Regions:
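Residue-level signal for inorganic ion chemistry
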Residues: 33, 78, 139, 170, ...
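Rossmann-like NAD(P) dinucleotide-binding subdomain of oxidoreductase/dehydrogenase enzymes
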Residues: 98-233
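Structural signal for hydrophobic packing residues in well-ordered secondary-structure cores
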Residues: 26, 41-44, 48, 59, ...
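Short, well-ordered beta-strand elements within core beta-sheets of diverse protein domains
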Residues: 20-26, 117, 223-225, 255-260, ...
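Conserved C-terminal structural/oligomerization subdomain of aldehyde/semialdehyde dehydrogenase
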Residues: 2-5, 28-29, 275, 322-466
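ALDH superfamily catalytic-core signature
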Residues: 3-5, 165, 198-332, 394, ...
């Protein structure tokens, strides 16, 4: 078991050593940061086959998914950061009002210090390494905790980092006891991806030390479908987004709100596309994943025991396999609608009016993602305007996560904070405002003793100079 890979580490001592390394100033320079990022990139390239193999063992990820959603994603992220870092680190000049005569103003990005990154099991490589890249780029030291559920990927990451980076700079934690003890320590930032329950616990512990956090959570991300939906490419995107990684994606469409006028056609086209992707027996498909653990298999299987299954429904506990499954005539009080599915189930709820569908979404927590499949621009915008979600996509699925020029993150129950692209640098930095003034002269009226003339002059100057 991965929990046995490393002995219990003294959490306080580990954080102390990281803070000592940070305080040495080694992480401050552009040269150091680029050197470490390039080393990490080379390390990932050299271990691509091992990463792919670990993901296959943990989640039965196909080679395409391993590259497309994990390895390539991270490499492109590093490339973007390396190419942009010099610019990001430069002080940002801002306008200085005349009132601050002979002065200049800027914002400089200072590293925060010691960062704690906690990752989930569903994309165990990408969701750990991506925030680590941002923390490294910003000049921090990082203690990182991969999920023990994705045991093979966890072990590989531990080996890659421990053999190539100073433990006081980058450290992987695989021991559960140490993981919990670390949450009692003072960090300069905590970045967590996972479920709401654990995220809430981390938020409470962080608050004791006034530690800022990013919480990437999840929720039930809805998918709106109207009668103008493109049943060709748009349907392919939708089915791919739902069943990639066997549905174990935090931004996967969770349930589908489909106009009753096209519901029958939508279902038939969805079934057709599932068969096109995974064949008559998805269990034999090399492209369809497996549920991560027996516990999660039992949970997801229980969500559709009493549901109306119109396609799929097959399970095999020995392989932790659940077929791509479509559920029709789903009610809001059904088990599948009570929690985030995180599995290959596709509940369909028909609607007669768009406002009726929007009301369903508003009745729950704010989701991490929201999808609209329609060719009607007015419909698209109405849904976006009337709902609140972390992010949104129109006629696309999941792909917004890889658009590094867009912020990614939740709102309300689906999370706190955003990252990706420059935001990954910004969240692990303190944007320090600086005003510099010349000592050649100053406004004499600012200094005591004060009188009515000075007050009147100050008011006039403020109106003119500010």
């Amino acid at each position: 078991m991965v929990a046995e890979l490393s002995t219990t580490i003294n959490a306080a001592e580990l954080v102390r050593k990281h803070r000592q390394f940070f305080n040495s100033g080694k992480t401050q320079s552009l040269e150091f940061r680029l050197e470490q990022l390039n080393k990490l990139r080379s390390l990932i390239k050299a271990n691509e086959s091992k990463i792919k193999e670990a993901l296959k063992k943990d989640l039965n990820k196909s080679e395409f998914e391993a590259y497309g959603t994990e390895i390539t994603f991270v490499l492109k992220d590093i490339d973007h950061v390396i190419a942009s870092l010099k610019k990001w680190m430069k002080p940002e000049r801002v306008k200085t009002p005349l009132f601050h005569q002979l002065g200049s103003s800027w914002i400089q990005s200072d590293p925060l210090g010691v960062v704690y990154v906690i990752a989930p099991w569903n994309y165990p490589f990408q969701l750990l390494i991506a925030p680590v890249i941002g923390a490294m780029a910003a000049g921090n030291t990082v203690i990182m905790k991969p999920s023990r559920m994705s045991a093979n990927t966890c072990q590989l990451i531990d080996e890659m980092i421990s053999k190539n980076f100073p433990a006081d700079y980058l450290k992987v934690i695989t021991n559960f006891q140490t993981t919990q003890e670390l949450l009692e320590e003072k960090f300069d930032y905590i970045f967590f991806t996972g479920g709401k329950e654990v995220g809430t616990e981390i938020y409470q512990k962080a608050a004791k030390n006034l530690t800022p956090v990013t919480l990437e959570l999840g929720g039930k991300s809805p998918c709106f479908v109207d009668e103008t939906m493109n049943m060709n490419w748009a349907m392919k995107r939708l089915i791919w987004g739902k069943f990639t990684n066997a549905g174990q994606t935090c931004v996967a469409p969770d349930y589908f709100l489909v106009d009753n006028k096209i519901k029958a056609k939508f279902i038939s086209e969805a079934i057709k596309t599932i068969k096109e992707f995974y064949g008559e027996d998805p269990k034999q498909s090399p492209d369809f994943g497996r549920i991560i653990t027996e516990k999660h298999f039992q949970r997801v299987s229980g969500l559709f025991k009493n549901a109306q299954v119109i396609h799929g429904g097959d399970t095999d506990a020995s392989q932790k396999y659940i077929a791509p499954t479509i559920l029709d005539n789903v009610k809001l009080d059904d088990a599948v609608m009570q929690e985030e599915i995180f599995g290959p189930l596709m509940p369909i709820i028909g609607y007669d009016s768009l406002d009726e569908a929007i009301k369903i979404v508003k009745s729950g927590g704010k989701p991490l993602a929201l999808y609209v499949y329609s060719e009607d621009k007015a419909y698209q915008q109405y849904v976006l305007n009337e709902t609140s979600s972390g992010n949104g996509s129109i006629n696309e699925c999941l792909m917004h996560v890889g658009q590094f020029n867009l912020p990614f993150g939740g709102v309300g129950d689906s999370g706190i904070g955003q990252y990706h692209g420059k935001l990954s640098f910004d969240i692990f930095s303190h944007r320090k405002g600086v005003l510099k003034k010349s000592t050649l002269t100053d406004l004499a009226l600012r200094f005591p003793p004060y009188n009515s003339n000075k007050v009147n002059m100050l008011n006039k100057l403020m109106d003119w100079l500010m």
